[in-house]
Swiss-Prot record:
Endpoints of the signal sequence: none
InterPro entries (UniProt xref): C-N_Hydrolase, C-N_Hydrolase_sf, Nitrilases_CHs
Documented EC number(s): 3.5.5.1, 3.5.5.5
Keyword set includes Glycoprotein: no
Domain CN hydrolase span(s) in chain numbering: 6-279
Keywords of this entry: Hydrolase
Species annotation: Hypocrea virens (strain Gv29-8 / FGSC 10586) (Gliocladium virens)
Family: Belongs to the carbon-nitrogen hydrolase superfamily. Nitrilase family.
Protein name in the entry: Arylacetonitrilase
Primary role: Nitrilase that hydrolyzes preferentially phenylacetonitrile and heteroaromatic nitriles, but has significantly lower activity for (R,S)-mandelonitrile. Also acts on dinitriles like phenylenediacetonitriles (PDAs) 1,2-PDA, 1,3-PDA, and 1,4-PDA, and cyanophenyl acetonitriles (CPAs) 2-CPA and 4-CPA.
Gene3D superfamilies the record matches: Carbon-nitrogen hydrolase
Catalytic activity: a nitrile + 2 H2O = a carboxylate + NH4(+); 4-chlorophenylacetonitrile + 2 H2O = 4-chlorophenylacetate + NH4(+)
CDD domains found in the cross-reference section: nitrilases_CHs
Transmembrane segments: none
Length: 329
């Protein structure tokens, strides 16, 4: 018998597009459902609240949708976030939540890890939004490099979407002794046109999550959203490069050796994927390779990290020195 088994849940669902309150309601229902099935952790996809801005891959700008998106994005210090925290606490389950964060009407692709006590353990932002995402979202600061927290059942962290192609960012995350990793993605197309890289398809993105599992030796919760015909009509993505056909749901779980340990849900369907994680498997894989431990060479190769918050207004060094000298006088 394994010493430690952790039951996890990965959602595959469609948000209520551009509707903060309705998506909060749906989130609480899914949290409660996962907890009722004895899950200790439930994962939600990238920008689950209020949904991914899919139209950015169809046209350069949409003023009306962008304004609605800003208004319906989630603030960290808000009654809506407090409600989600209370829901996690009442259900007794940890929650990894991807959301569009509104900070003074600037947006960020963000994630919070909420413990079963309802407290926020990690709040991070995507370090660099990908390609067209930069028309909507800003960059993270250095403090968001701390992305893993200890929960009662293990160490949990997350990255968003194509952060999984960033070798240095991945390595920084792995050094935090992660055991369970949430890979948060938007709806993913099974097929795309020749002009779109294969790495942006559902299979390409699953490959990135699976590679992270092998590199890190962690369990990876690959979490995606669904977009329906109604969602396509609401967001005006029909005929666009991505997220223009119903589907997008490819949620699954990978073991630390890279094997898929869950069955797929049909990509147009909503549901929750569950798995019981045998945490002894982490030890078996670390025996073979530990890229931040016995299988590393820090005498030859190492990573430098700055975790500072860089404020937009800060004194010049000369002014700081002058202030110090004035005090001495």
């Amino acid at each position: 018998m394994p010493d430690r088994v952790v039951r996890v849940a990965v959602t595959q669902a469609e948000p209520v597009w551009l509707d903060l309150q309705a998506t909060i309601e749906k989130t609480c229902r899914l949290i409660t459902e996962a907890a009722s099935n004895n899950a200790q952790l439930v994962a939600f996809p990238e920008t689950w609240i209020p949904g991914y801005p899919c139209w950015i891959w169809s046209r350069l700008v949409d003023f009306d949708l962008n304004v609605a998106y800003i208004k319906n994005s989630l603030r960290v210090d808000s009654p809506e976030m407090e409600r989600l925290q209370a829901c996690a606490r009442e259900a007794g389950i940890a929650v990894s939540l991807g959301f569009s964060e509104n900070s003074n009407n600037s947006l960020y692709i963000s994630n919070v890890l909420i413990g079963s006590d309802g407290e926020i353990k990690v709040h991070r932002r995507k370090m660099k939004p990908t390609h067209m995402e930069r028309t909507v979202f800003g960059d993270a600061s250095g403090h968001c490099l701390q992305s893993v927290a200890q929960l009662p059942f293990g160490r949990v962290g997350s990255l968003s979407c194509w952060e999984h192609i960033q070798p240095l960012l991945k390595y920084n995350t792995i050094t935090q002794n992660e055991e369970i990793h949430v890979a948060a993605w938007p709806p993913l197309n099974s097929e795309v046109g020749d002009e779109i890289p294969w790495s942006m398809t559902a299979e390409g993105c699953k490959t990135l999550s699976r590679t992270y599992a092998i590199e890190s030796g962690t369990f990876v919760l690959h979490c995606t959203a669904v977009i329906s015909e109604s969602g396509i009509n609401s967001l005006g993505t029909l005929g666009g490069a991505l997220m223009s056909t119903p589907g997008g749901g490819h949620s699954t779980i990978f073991g630390p050796d890279g094997r898929r340990i869950t069955d797929h849900i049909e990509e147009t369907s909503e549901g929750i994927v569950y798995a019981n994680l045998d945490m002894d498997e982490l030890v078996v894989n670390k025996m073979f390779a530990d890229c931040t431990g016995h299988y590393s060479r820090p005498d030859l190769l190492w990573l430098g990290v700055s975790q500072e918050i860089k404020p937009v207004v800060r004194p010049q060094r000369a002014e700081v020195d002058k202030g110090t000298n004035d005090q001495v006088e």
